[in-house]
């Protein structure tokens, strides 16, 4: 399927251009493809499409319902979770059904592969590069400009950059520029949005510290097994 991957050296035109290959980017690209649109997904690293960060889980309190809503609306996250899950558990079972929340711990590498295969199998073009600016014509977005100066034209642009826009990582007292640990941030899109009159801000997400397993008294811990009869996320999972 590698014919779907290419380095842009000339102008290309798409109906929908998605910037970023995380959960939101994958869903956006696949839904647009289902609507028979010509779709391209821009990412700095094809192997990072669908990459899960520090906590490889899907769903949980409040979030599990959203995953199922995505499934009903034609999304793919629920299918990926069911296919790659290693532990399934419905939370809040001691309370009313309205607050029951499905959660799955998944194999993060298998999830990446499943997501990438789905994107490539759908005929979506993977554009390797870093989007640094929005291209506009007559007060409408008409594409993006990449770091190497290439232009990708489209009728619509969907930004799903996650934590990468001018991303910073704080570890103790140290601060460094990164979109994710070990990955470069995306610089330029934020400034492009600001130049178009959008207000920008900064959100924060936290990662809990890791413990050395040899420093833990395991006799004080309690196992939390998954459900004996796992409940899938997708209504289409048999």
Q: Predicted segment positions?
A:
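Conserved N-terminal/central alpha/beta ligand/cofactor-binding core
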Residues: 13, 30-133, 156, 160-180, ...
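Conserved beta-strand-loop-beta-strand element in the redox core of flavoprotein oxidoreductases
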Residues: 135-151
């Amino acid at each position: 399927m590698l014919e779907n991957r290419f380095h842009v050296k000339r102008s290309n035109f798409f109906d929908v251009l998605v910037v970023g290959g995380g959960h939101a980017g994958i869903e956006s690209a696949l839904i647009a493809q289902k609507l028979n649109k010509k779709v391209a997904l821009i990412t700095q690293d094809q192997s990072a499409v669908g990459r899960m960060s520090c906590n490889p889980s899907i769903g949980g309190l409040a979030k599990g319902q959203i995953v199922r809503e995505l499934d009903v609306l034609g999304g793919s996250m629920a299918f990926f979770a069911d296919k790659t899950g290693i532990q399934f558990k419905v939370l809040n079972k001691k309370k009313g059904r309205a607050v029951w929340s499905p959660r799955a711990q998944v194999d993060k590498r298998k999830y990446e592969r499943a997501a990438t295969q789905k994107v490539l199998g759908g005929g979506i073009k993977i554009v390797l590069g870093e989007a640094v600016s929005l291209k506009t014509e007559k007060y409408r977005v008409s594409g993006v400009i990449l770091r190497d100066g290439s232009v990708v034209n489209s009728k619509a642009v969907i930004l799903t950059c996650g934590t990468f826009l001018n991303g910073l990582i704080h570890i103790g007292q140290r601060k460094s520029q990164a979109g994710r640990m070990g990955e470069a941030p995306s610089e330029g899109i934020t400034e492009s949005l600001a130049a178009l009159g959008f207000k920008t801000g900064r959100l924060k997400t936290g990662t809990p510290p890791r413990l050395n397993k040899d420093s833990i008294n395991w006799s004080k811990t309690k196992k939390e097994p998954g459900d004996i009869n796992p409940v899938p996320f997708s209504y289409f999972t048999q």
